[in-house]
Design a protein with these regions (language model features):
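Carbohydrate-interacting/catalytic domains
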Residues: 1-102, 108, 116-117, 124, ...
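Conserved, mostly hydrophobic/aromatic
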Residues: 7, 101, 160, 170, ...
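Aromatic/hydrophobic pocket-lining residues that form the small-molecule binding cavity
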Residues: 51, 153, 231, 235, ...
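Loop/turn elements at helix/coil->beta-strand transitions in domains of secreted/extracellular proteins
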Residues: 95-96, 163-168, 243-250, 343-348, ...
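Substrate-binding/active-site clefts of carbohydrate-active enzymes
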Residues: 103-166, 173-342, 370, 376, ...
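Short, solvent-exposed turn/loop segments enriched in Gly/Ser/Thr/Pro and often Arg
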Residues: 103-105, 168-180, 252-262, 351-356, ...
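Extended substrate-binding grooves/exosites of carbohydrate-active enzymes
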Residues: 142-149, 267, 273-279, 283-326, ...
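Conserved alpha/beta catalytic core and glycan-binding cleft of carbohydrate-active enzymes
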Residues: 261-264, 335-336, 342, 367, ...
């Protein structure tokens, strides 16, 4: 297949341009141009192998190089452009607006499925049914349940649709004993506490009892086939309704580890002797699931607790894929099952994906097989991974589509606007308002993505693992056990938060709203970041602001799919452009407590002389306005005053 590669240079600014492709130096010819730019082009033949390239530019006696990191005096091959033939991501995901729901804390639509007091024992305590919806999470919150469920999500679909949401991402929803459900008990079924309980028999644990073998009510609720099948059926109906509204659904895939309650291990002896279930690997050395886990003491059966736990957590047994083809096959079938009829989920978010397996070699092998399985079942399903650090080796077209964008989004914008780390664990005054650090971090970490992956990267300000962004605006270091939950609400700055949302909705990728952020929810890091959605106590102005920014994001193709280029960086100011061939958007963030006069060279993003730039959004410390104001570009420069503590979005007419 013939592939044309183009290079843009300022008109009459360079003498020669070469495409250096897989080591071959190819002259590029001027194909066309306008009064601003010359466009050089070269055509290459693509096969099945990766294409690696950069540009060499000559202007008089000056030679420079251009790669993903930008213009360099010497080329660094680590930043070369790459094309992986056949690699594509779902088109529906590019620029799509995601909404993350931690189900137990979103909305209680069915009180009949609520976890009961002392229904079972989990991590040093009997379960607690929290009856005050607005009560702050306890410091040891994992066994406290507020009653949020999938019926609650169904009840609030009108709200999500009106907000402008395209994709709902659920934290885990499969049978699990914790409220976060990253300790899967049964991958085949939706937890009836989130779904439907149609047969509700048995008693809760007696006072003081820690033996879950006696938790008759819980055992019935999560093993009774009527409850499990009714819950799966309700999930089918929920996905159908979401799809009818033009939205998608993403599930959380926890495949590195499961839970100690899992039927394959059964440390709690919940499934022992139950009809239709075989002995778990904890119960017996003869269990058909023994190879699913790595045991360190072969002499402890029955009831062998020497299994390998993820990071030493005995409630999170690590899955032993290398020694169990049966386990691998099972998980691949799970991956296919939920993206196929009748469930028809639109993709997976993969928990701690780089940790899976016991070697890097096996990890990559597993995800290649996983991608093949999922894409064969549903070619339009997205595969996005939780990942900290350089994702490049997984984003080569054969494993993940993209990642949760910590390094090239959440972390840099948090440092720039708030000066704190994303857990609120550290303050760095040298990074607060530092444009060089911000732009450098963004350019470097974005260079680790393939272009398709960057366009669908999950851009979050907050999530279930980090402090709420609105709390970060108070620039305090703390957690709920050090400063207390009330402190997360104090000294917050909604003006800074609005700047962050403007950035989120105008930056390349898929902006992802963590439930409640749009309603003014605060919170320190886990577990305080998992407060309930404040129904009836919402910050209506912030919801309206999110709705308006989402509308702006969707209105302009340049914000959904356009290129990005930094135009200006100064103390506490950043400015960038998003642009396609025929549409340009300019964004200005001024975090100074004074107005700043700017002269922006906008020709680099394709804004011609005498163009009119129309302001469509202005935020400030008190609120925001959609009142439009026009600015004329003269001598290829946009002269504009950026008000103190503001964010501006301008669109070329």
């Amino acid at each position: 297949e013939q592939v044309k590669i183009r290079f843009r240079a300022s008109a009459d600014n360079v003498d020669r341009v070469y495409l250096v492709c897989n080591g071959e130096k190819i002259p590029m010819d001027v194909e066309d141009g306008n009064k601003l730019f010359d466009f050089y082009a070269a055509t290459i033949t693509a096969g099945e192998n990766m294409i690696n390239y950069y540009f060499e530019i000559h202007s008089g006696r000056v030679t420079c190089f251009y790669n993903k990191y930008g213009v360099e005096k010497e080329n660094n091959n680590d930043f070369n452009f790459e094309i992986y033939p056949g690699f594509s991501v779902p088109k529906w995901a590019e620029g799509a607006v995601f909404y993350q729901i931690f189900v137990d804390r979103f909305c209680n639509g069915d009180p009949d499925n609520d976890v009961l007091d002392n229904e079972y024992f989990y991590i040093n305590s009997g379960t607690k049914q929290v009856k005050d919806w607005f009560k702050y999470p306890e410091n040891m919150d994992v066994g406290c349940f507020y009653g949020g469920d999938l019926q609650g999500v169904m009840n609030k679909l009108d709200y999500l649709q009106d907000l402008g949401i395209d994709v709902i991402y659920f934290n885990p929803v499969f049978v699990s004993p914790s409220n976060h459900k990253y300790d899967i008990q049964d991958y085949d079924y939706i937890d009836p506490h989130f779904g439907k309980i149609v047969v509700d028999e048995g008693s809760v644990l007696p006072d003081g009892c820690r033996e879950n073998k006696q938790s008759a009510r819980y055992i019935n609720r999560v093993t009774n086939k009527a409850n499990l099948e009714a819950s799966n059926q309700f999930f089918i109906e929920l996905v159908e309704e979401i799809h009818k509204r033009g939205m998608k659904v993403i599930l959380d895939g926890v495949f590195n580890h499961c839970g100690s309650f899992n039927k394959w291990l059964d440390r709690e002896r919940i499934y022992e002797g139950e009809e239709g279930y075989e002995n778990g690997a904890y119960i017996s050395a003869d269990s058909p699931y023994r190879s699913f886990f790595k045991f360190h003491n072969e002499c402890e059966w029955p009831y062998n607790g020497s299994y390998d736990g993820w990071w030493g957590h005995d409630t999170l047994p690590k899955l032993n894929y290398e020694e169990s083809d049966k386990l691998t096959e099972y998980i691949m079938n799970i991956a296919k099952k939920w993206v196929s009829p009748p469930y028809n989920v639109d993709g997976w978010r993969l928990d701690v994906a780089a940790d899976l397996g016991h070697s890097a070699e096996y990890n990559h092998r597993f995800w290649r097989e996983f991608r093949k399985a999922v894409k064969e079942a549903n070619p339009e399903a997205i595969i996005l991974a939780e990942h900290y650090g350089d994702p490049k080796q997984w984003l080569r077209g054969d494993q993940w589509d993209t990642v949760m964008n910590y390094d090239a989004f959440m972390e840099p914008i948090t440092w720039f606007l708030c000066g704190v780390e994303k857990h609120s664990d550290e303050f760095r005054g040298d990074l607060l308002g530092n444009p060089d650090a911000f732009i450098g971090a963004m350019n470097y970490h974005m260079s680790r993505f393939q272009r398709p992956s960057l366009g669908v990267a999950m851009n979050e300000l907050s999530n279930h693992d980090h402090s709420r962004f609105l709390t970060r605006t108070n620039r305090k270091v703390g957690r709920t056990h050090t400063l207390g939950p009330d402190a997360a609400n104090y000294d917050i700055d909604k003006g800074i938060f609005r700047q962050a949302v403007v950035f989120q909705m105008t930056w390349p990728g898929a902006p992802t709203v963590y439930y409640g952020d749009e309603a003014g929810l605060c919170g320190w890091t886990d577990p305080d970041n998992r407060r309930t959605y404040p129904w009836g106590r919402e910050d209506v102005e912030l919801i309206r602001f999110h709705k308006d920014m989402i509308k702006i994001h969707k209105t302009y193709e340049a914000l959904m799919k356009g290129s990005v280029l930094f135009l200006h960086g100064a103390h506490k100011i950043i400015c960038y452009g998003r642009f396609t061939d025929n549409k340009q958007v300019i964004v200005i963030l001024n975090t100074n407590y004074e107005d700043v006069d700017l002269r922006l060279h906008v020709r680099r993003v394709g804004v011609f002389n005498h163009s009119i730039m129309t302001r469509v959004m202005l935020t400030n410390e008190q609120g925001y306005t959609l009142e439009t104001v026009d600015y004329m570009v003269e001598h290829n420069i946009l002269t504009i005053k950026a008000p103190k503590m503001s964010a501006m979005v301008l669109v070329r007419k």
